[in-house]
Amino acid sequence: MLKKFFKEISYKKSYVLAFSGGLDSTVLLHMISLYIKKIKNNNNFFKKIFKFRAVYINHNICKESKYWSNHCHDQCLKYKVFFKSINIFISDFSEGIESSARRERYKALFSDLNPEEVLITAHHQDDQIETILLSLKRGSGPRGISGMQSIKKFDSHIIKRPLLHCKKEDIKLYAIKHNLNWIDDKSNLNIKFDRNFLRSEIIPLLKKRWPNIGNTISRSAKLCFDQEKLLNELLKDTLNSLVEKDKSLKFIELFKMSEIKRFAILRKWFCLNNFKMPSLSQLKHIWKNVIISKKDSKAEIKINNNIIKRFKKNLYFIPIYSKNHLKNIIFKTSLNHSKKIVLPYDLGTLITKPIMINENFIKKINFFYYNNKKKFIFLINLNYMKKMSFTVKLWILFIC
């Protein structure tokens, strides 16, 4: 297992381990510490350019989380690995505890990554089986059944899973052999959660009946991944011709396609925007109630934390943000009346234009201060009702 691991890791990279203190990530931490010793013994120059640290995400859900953070810190101290604990607080559980925690965990990990760093996770073959079985339960297509990949690019970041082809039993034997100390999270025994149910009740039965099922499921996942990759190649040119610079989708050409190709294009558009794959019923709803609905209707559908909306001949992804989230955004930019100002979080673009104002207008303006001393910007928001059935918001900014 160590030989395979050393082949997966390059001393030229900078790595960040998602460290929970559990069995799997503890084994991975130990393996990396051995790798550091190995390259140090070979050449001290390698040690200098190989960078590695561990990050623990405290979800603040379990009362033991503080203890777990301390345990992870002690383990990293033992191996002389830089450690960081990040606190997150989940306010939206609409996707369920597991999915919501996973979403916020990865958001925190990616936010902490430097551009040159690769995120390492301790997912193994049994995790892959769970993921694929859950995809089958949801009725997923080839992309879902392809499961996790040993290397995956997500936006500008890379995730590496060097233990993905290792069996859970082998990982535990490794931990016992090296006398490792890890955390057993009792919540993993709660079978009301689907993943725990599969882990505790279903997968042991499958392995007992078919001992090699982990390898065969992984092989099927690889075949599905190859099919999905081929589909991407075949649809690439068509998709590129339909997607605008703002990532909106021109849907007129979809009317000329078969339903199979049309839905495949829509799925690829979701992937391009890094959003969760829609179900078949959601795709049908987008087509029937958004794309081909009446022009004067409010053609939109809410999927997770986004709204799919039609405007003229294009489909748009519009993120849903809470008012509190938007209030906390600090956005700095140089103001030039001849340029457009692109707002963060895909909130749109401001077109700047100089205007004449009077004294009464100035009295309505809100003042913002920098360090409570230097006045640097005025901001006002006015609503204008047009004859159309929508509201236009005008933001006026001044530099003092």
Swiss-Prot record:
It is an enzyme of class 6 (ligase). Keywords: ATP-binding, Cytoplasm, Ligase, Nucleotide-binding, tRNA processing. One of its GO terms (biological process) is tRNA modification. One of its GO terms (cellular component) is cytoplasm. Its EC number is 6.3.4.19. Its main location: cytoplasm. ATP binds at residues 20-25. GO terms for molecular function: ATP binding; tRNA(Ile)-lysidine synthase activity. It catalyses: cytidine(34) in tRNA(Ile2) + L-lysine + ATP = lysidine(34) in tRNA(Ile2) + AMP + diphosphate + H(+). It is found in: Cytoplasm. Ligates lysine onto the cytidine present at position 34 of the AUA codon-specific tRNA(Ile) that contains the anticodon CAU, in an ATP-dependent manner. Cytidine is converted to lysidine, thus changing the amino acid specificity of the tRNA from methionine to isoleucine. Belongs to the tRNA(Ile)-lysidine synthase family. HAMAP family: tRNA_Ile_lys_synt. The N-terminal region contains the highly conserved SGGXDS motif, predicted to be a P-loop motif involved in ATP binding. This is tRNA(Ile)-lysidine synthase. The gene is tilS.
